[in-house]
């Protein structure tokens, strides 16, 4: 049996690039100067150009402010940082294991504080209403940084724009929900910052989930140091919360004791999520850069899948590496970046494919399907993956089906008890076999 982690593939000395701020990620994006409305306009235009990265320079309801969509995709991030997908996964895993402290800077060195709204009015920001099925305008790419009783948390939470200074935010049962419940039990509100458009290292760290109280900003700092060769710089807002200094927006707010209706909302699977009573957030100040660019992520599209799925890849790869060498993990588009993955391995002995399937499903408990392929197959290419299935997989002996497994809340087909069945497909060649009849010249 293979044991132990494989060595990281990235080369530390050659992976530092000058691109740091969110707006730097927009190099090469489509520029749209025609008037675009926050009400369905961004989604409609994005669909018309096949969801390429795009910057909207003329938002009808937000004079002088801009927005961007389709910025974060795995291939695009790898191209920008000049790394392979496998290296990106290894760097994410390294940062999780090696958190570091960010650097606090003075307010005069923080671009995010270049402008402050005279009176808070969120309706004047480029907050989009993408799908007609949504309740209304939503922040979907903003992260919440909260601190309570010495614990800091940074995470994504969608926010429905209720009125000029209030949003209603969906808190799933994770760390921020636990923090909020604890504060409410004490009759206390929580001071927070809502950050939109930080650099990619912050966005990736905010999308990670940990079983313990690990400060996501320290993971972002490690990523920033590895990819940029510089510390992640934070600035302290007047409410005491520290935020990335080069973010596009930093908004001072508090989680109140009140709840209100949140939803419906088109979630990552493209299905419509329910209406629930969720916490109300009151906004007290809005700061932003000059000509700020609002990150207006489109739910169920490429950025949503990237931010949901990419941070799961390191945990899956680590789990698989415990039993067999693993070179890549790709959370598939058809699985909404969450429910299905393709895993590339190098089998060493008979049965390694099945071992890899079980390890991958353990590494990401929400996953419903995993396909294991050889390292000569591009995990991100569905045509090549299907080719591997058709030429290397025998359904009656290379398939694992598990019943009565804990399912994902994002899967509407799961049972009322939350249980589902899961499937693993082994499309690898047996070790030692003559590979020539199975190799493609295409």
PLM regions and their residue ranges:
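Low-complexity, intrinsically disordered or signal/transmembrane-proximal segments
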Residues: 2-5, 12-13
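Extended, highly charged
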Residues: 10-264, 270-280, 284-442
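Accessible peptide chain termini
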Residues: 1-2, 20
């Amino acid at each position: 049996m293979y044991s132990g982690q494989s060595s990281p593939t990235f080369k530390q000395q050659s992976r530092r690039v000058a691109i740091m701020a969110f707006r730097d990620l927009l190099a090469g994006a489509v520029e749209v100067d025609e008037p675009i409305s926050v009400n369905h306009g961004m989604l409609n235009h994005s669909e018309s150009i096949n969801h390429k990265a795009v910057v909207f320079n003329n938002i009808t309801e937000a004079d002088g402010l801009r927005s961007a969509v389709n910025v974060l995709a795995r291939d695009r991030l790898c191209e920008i940082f000049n790394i392979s997908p496998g290296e990106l996964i290894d760097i994410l895993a390294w940062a999780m294991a090696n958190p570091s402290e960010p650097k606090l800077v003075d307010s005069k060195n923080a671009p995010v504080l270049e402008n402050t709204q005279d009176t808070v009015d969120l309706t004047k920001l480029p907050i989009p209403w993408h799908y007609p099925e949504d309740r209304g305008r939503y922040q979907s790419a903003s992260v919440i940084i909260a601190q309570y009783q010495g614990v800091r948390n940074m995470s994504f939470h969608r926010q429905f724009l209720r009125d000029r200074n209030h949003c209603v935010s969906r808190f799933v049962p994770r760390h921020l929900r636990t923090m909020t419940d604890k504060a409410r039990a004490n009759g206390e509100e929580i001071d927070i910052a809502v950050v939109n458009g930080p650099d990619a290292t912050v966005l990736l760290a905010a999308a990670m989930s940990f079983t313990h109280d690990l400060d996501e900003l320290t993971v972002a700092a490690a990523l920033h140091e590895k990819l940029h060769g510089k510390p992640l710089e934070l600035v302290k807002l007047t409410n005491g919360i520290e935020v990335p200094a080069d973010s596009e927006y930093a908004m001072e707010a508090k989680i109140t004791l009140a709840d209100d209706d949140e939803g419906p909302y088109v979630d990552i699977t493209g299905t419509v999520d329910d209406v629930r009573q969720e916490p109300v957030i009151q906004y007290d100040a809005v700061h932003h850069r000059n000509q700020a660019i609002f990150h207006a992520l489109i739910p169920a599209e490429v950025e949503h899948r990237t931010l949901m799925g990419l941070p799961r890849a390191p945990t899956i790869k680590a789990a698989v590496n415990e039993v067999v060498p693993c070179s890549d993990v790709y959370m598939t588009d058809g699985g909404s970046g969450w429910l299905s993955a393709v895993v590339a391995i190098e089998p060493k002995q008979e049965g390694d494919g099945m071992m890899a399937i079980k390890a991958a499903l353990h590494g990401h408990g929400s996953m419903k399907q995993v396909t294991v392929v050889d390292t000569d197959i591009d995990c991100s290419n569905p045509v090549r993956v299907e080719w591997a299935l058709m030429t290397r997989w025998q359904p009656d002996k290379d398939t694992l089906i598990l019943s009565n497994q804990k399912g994902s809340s994002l899967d509407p087909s799961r049972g009322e008890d939350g249980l589902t069945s899961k499937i693993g497909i082994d499309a690898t060649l047996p070790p030692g076999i003559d590979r020539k009849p199975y190799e493609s010249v295409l």
